[in-house]
C-alpha cells in the first residue's frame, strides 16, 4: 500500500528574508548591548548570527534569550566544546557510517547544505559495538561546530547570501516502533537536547521519506520530544516523495538512492563524500579572512534597512532609544552606588575621629561622662 498522507506540512515561506528584517536586526544589536552591559558578551561565539539564533529561539524576548545564551556558554565550558572541536578524533568514523549511514551531501536550490540519514539501514547493535553513545555525541558536537564555522560560511559565499540552516532528509524505510529501543531513545534524546538547546534555529526543513504505516506509531512518540517550531518545519512523506524533494533539490545534488543522479563513486558513496562548497579551496581561503562574511552581511543589512517602511524605522528607533536609556540608567545607578560607598567610608572615618576625641576629653575630665558615637 502506498503511503501518501503527510502528518505535518511546511510552507516554503521566505525565512531568510524574515531573518534579515530590519526589526530583527535591530533586536540583535539590542541583545548585544544587553549582554555587553552585564559583562556577558564573549570574545568568541558572540557573533551576529549566533545572537540572532538565540533571539529567534526565544521569540526575540531579550531576557529569555539572554538566559538561553548564558546556558549555552556555560555548556561550552563545562563540556569542553572547543577542545572537542579541535582535538577529538573519531577513529571509528568509517565503521560507524556502515552501520548508521548519514552525512552531509551538497546543497539544495537555496544554497543550504543537505544532511541525510538512512535510518532504515541502521544496525544499532553493530553501531554500539563500533562506538559508544558518549563518543558519538562528541563526534556529533564536532560536526555541528564544523557546520557553524565552515559549512554555513562556505554556503553563504557560494550562494552570495546568508546561509545559517540545513535541509535534512531522513529515509525511514522499514522503521517502526521496534527500532525505538532504549539505547536508540537515549541517543535520540541526547542529540535532540544538544541541538535544540545549543544549536537552535539551524533546521530549515526536514523531509521524512518512505514513511510506512508502522512509522506512524513511532512518529507519535518522537513528536513529544520536538518543540512546535521544529515540528512546523517537518514534512512526513510516503514512498511517493520524489516530486517534493525535486522542488527543493536539483537531481544532480540528490543521491540515486533517493531518486537523484549523484553517486559520488569516487568517495565510496554520497554519504561518505561530505561533498559541498565547504571543500572548495578558494572558498575555504576566503573563510579564513574574518571580514569576508561580516562585510557581505553588513552590506546586505544596509540595503534591507534602507528599504524598510517608515513605521518600522520608527519602531526600531524606539527600541534603540529604550536601550540607550537603560544603559544610561545603569551607569547612573553604578555611579550613585560608588558615591554612597565613598560617603559611608567617610562617615565611618569621621566617627572614629570623634570617638577618639571623646576618649581624650574623658581622660582629661574623668568625672564627666561623655557619650560616644554609636557604631554604624
Swiss-Prot record:
Coiled-coil residues: 323-357
Positions with biased composition (Basic and acidic residues): 1-20
Localization annotation: Golgi apparatus membrane; Cell membrane
Membrane topology recorded in Swiss-Prot or TrEMBL: Peripheral membrane protein
Organism: Arabidopsis thaliana
Domain (CRAL-TRIO) ranges: 92-266
Disulfide bonds: none
Top-level lineage group: Eukaryota
Keywords in alphabetical order: Cell membrane, Coiled coil, Golgi apparatus, Membrane, Protein transport, Transport
Gene of this entry: SFH11
UniProt keyword Transport present: yes
Classification of source organism: Eukaryota, Viridiplantae, Streptophyta, Embryophyta, Tracheophyta
Pfam families: CRAL_TRIO (PF00650)
The protein, known as: Phosphatidylinositol/phosphatidylcholine transfer protein SFH11
Similarity comment text for this entry: Belongs to the SFH family.
Annotated region (Disordered), positions in chain: 1-24
Annotated GO CC locations: Golgi membrane; plasma membrane
Example of a GO biological process term: protein transport
Annotated function: Required for transport of secretory proteins from the Golgi complex. Catalyzes the transfer of phosphatidylinositol and phosphatidylcholine between membranes in vitro.
Amino acid at each position: 500500500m502506498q503511503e501518501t498522507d503527510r502528518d505535518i506540512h511546511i510552507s516554503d515561506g521566505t525565512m531568510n528574508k524574515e531573518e534579515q528584517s530590519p526589526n530583527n536586526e535591530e533586536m540583535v544589536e539590542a541583545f548585544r548591548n544587553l549582554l555587553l552591559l552585564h559583562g556577558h558578551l564573549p570574545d568568541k561565539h558572540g557573533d551576529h548570527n549566533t545572537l540572532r539564533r538565540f533571539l529567534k529561539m526565544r521569540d526575540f524576548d531579550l531576557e529569555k534569550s539572554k538566559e538561553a545564551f548564558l546556558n549555552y556558554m556555560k555548556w561550552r565550558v563545562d563540556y569542553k566544546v572547543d577542545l572537542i572541536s579541535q582535538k577529538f578524533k573519531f577513529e571509528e568514523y568509517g565503521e560507524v557510517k556502515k552501520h548508521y549511514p548519514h552525512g552531509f551531501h551538497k546543497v539544495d536550490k537555496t544554497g543550504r547544505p543537505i544532511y541525510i540519514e538512512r535510518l532504515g539501514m541502521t544496525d544499532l547493535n553493530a553501531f554500539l559495538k563500533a562506538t559508544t553513545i558518549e563518543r558519538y555525541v562528541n563526534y556529533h558536537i564536532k560536526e555541528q561546530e564544523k557546520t557553524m564555522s565552515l559549512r554555513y560560511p562556505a554556503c553563504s559565499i557560494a550562494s552570495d547570501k546568508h546561509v545559517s540552516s540545513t535541509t535534512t532528509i531522513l529515509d525511514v524505510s522499514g522503521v517502526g516502533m521496534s527500532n525505538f529501543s532504549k539505547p536508540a531513545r537515549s541517543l535520540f534524546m541526547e542529540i535532540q537536547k544538544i541541538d535544540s538547546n545549543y544549536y537552535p534555529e539551524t533546521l530549515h526543513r526536514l523531509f521524512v521519506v518512505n514513511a510506512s504505516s508502522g512509522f506512524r506509531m513511532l512518529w507519535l512518540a518522537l513528536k513529544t520530544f520536538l518543540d512546535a517550531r521544529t515540528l512546523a518545519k517537518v514534512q512526513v512523506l510516503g514512498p511517493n516523495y520524489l516530486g517534493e524533494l525535486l522542488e527543493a533539490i536539483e537531481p544532480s545534488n540528490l543521491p540515486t538512492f533517493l531518486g537523484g543522479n549523484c553517486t559520488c563513486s569516487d568517495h565510496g558513496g554520497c554519504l561518505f563524500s561530505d561533498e559541498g562548497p565547504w571543500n572548495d579551496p578558494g572558498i575555504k581561503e576566503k573563510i579564513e579572512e574574518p571580514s569576508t562574511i561580516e562585510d557581505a552581511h553588513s552590506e546586505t543589512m544596509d540595503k534591507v534597512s534602507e528599504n524598510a517602511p517608515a513605521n518600522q524605522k520608527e519602531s526600531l528607533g524606539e527600541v534603540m532609544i529604550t536601550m540607550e536609556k537603560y544603559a544610561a540608567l545603569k551607569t547612573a545607578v553604578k555611579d550613585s552606588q560608588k558615591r554612597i560607598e565613598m560617603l559611608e567610608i567617610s562617615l565611618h572615618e569621621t566617627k572614629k575621629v570623634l570617638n577618639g576625641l571623646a576618649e581624650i576629653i574623658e581622660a582629661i575630665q574623668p568625672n564627666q561622662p561623655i557619650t560616644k558615637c554609636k557604631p554604624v
